[in-house]
């Protein structure tokens, strides 16, 4: 009964800490700070001594933080971890495709593999080595670490989307300025030419385009009419124009 009570108290404590950690992750929009908070949470809540954090970039695992000695020497072997979908003890993985990877992890004294999931896809990997008190990780500890890792991954993805939104908004503002400049280069009025009616208007299918026109009086009754149309649309065409 005492053991059950201790386990229950531990679960309640972990749930409360997950709630608090989730709020902290929710206000961070920089990948470096999110990874740092994840590291501190693992060390503070589980007493993790050595760990490594990988994130998926261009279908490869990129090491973002590590306290595991000599890990860098095995980075190529660890790329297959990108296919791991469930957390577990290193010794429990039996997949043939992970054989060399698991052997390398055992040599590095890594005990736990935790995929960092987002929308049912492995977006990162968390490796846990020994703890400060050298106690083994329980199933509850693995579940807790997995929860923290997934919260961190959600925060990282939200931060990425936030950055993309800001960049898109900035680009739209710059394109609008470019449109105003481009429209300003077009003649506001056309000269009256005897025996000719000339009308011109430029309505781009996008914010900027590759069309241009001009009517210039040379001398007396001589005029030059210029009409240009760059192949393509949008920004590439406008840059050429």
Model-derived regions: residue spans:
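Signal-transmission/dimerization alpha-helices at domain junctions
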Residues: 1, 119-125, 144-167
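Signal-transmission linkers at sensory-effector interfaces
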Residues: 1-25
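Amphipathic alpha-helical coiled-coil segments that mediate homodimerization
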Residues: 17-25, 30-49, 53, 181, ...
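… and, occasionally, acidic/histidine-rich disordered N-termini of signaling adaptors
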Residues: 31-32, 166-241
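GAF sensory/regulatory domain recognition
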Residues: 40, 50-79, 220, 230
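Acidic/proline- and glycine-rich, intrinsically disordered low-complexity segments
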Residues: 66-108
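A short, aliphatic-rich beta-strand micro-motif
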Residues: 109-118, 124
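Regulatory loop-to-helix N-cap segments in sensory/regulatory domains
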Residues: 126-148, 233
């Amino acid at each position: 009964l005492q053991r059950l009570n201790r386990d229950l108290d531990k679960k309640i404590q972990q749930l409360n800490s997950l709630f608090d950690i989730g709020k902290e992750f929710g206000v961070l929009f920089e990948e470096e700070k999110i990874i740092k908070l994840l590291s501190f949470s693992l060390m503070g809540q589980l007493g993790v001594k050595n760990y490594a954090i990988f994130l998926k970039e261009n279908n490869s695992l990129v090491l973002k933080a590590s306290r595991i000695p000599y890990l860098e020497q095995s980075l190529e072997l660890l790329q297959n971890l990108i296919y791991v979908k469930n957390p577990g003890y290193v010794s429990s993985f039996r997949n043939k495709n992970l054989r060399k990877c698991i052997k390398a992890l055992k040599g590095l004294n890594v005990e736990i593999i935790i995929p960092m999931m987002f929308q049912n896809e492995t977006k990162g990997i968390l490796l846990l080595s020994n703890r400060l008190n050298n106690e083994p990780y329980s199933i509850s500890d693995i579940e807790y670490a997995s929860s923290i890792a997934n919260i961190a991954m959600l925060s990282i993805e939200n931060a990425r989307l936030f950055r993309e939104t800001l960049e898109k908004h900035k680009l739209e503002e710059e394109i609008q300025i470019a449109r105003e400049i481009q429209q300003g280069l077009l003649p506001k009025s056309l000269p009256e030419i005897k025996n000719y009616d000339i009308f011109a208007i430029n309505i781009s299918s996008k914010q900027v385009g590759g069309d241009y026109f001009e009517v210039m009086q040379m001398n007396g009754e001589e005029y030059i009419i210029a009409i240009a149309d760059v192949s393509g649309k949008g920004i590439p065409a406008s840059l050429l124009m």
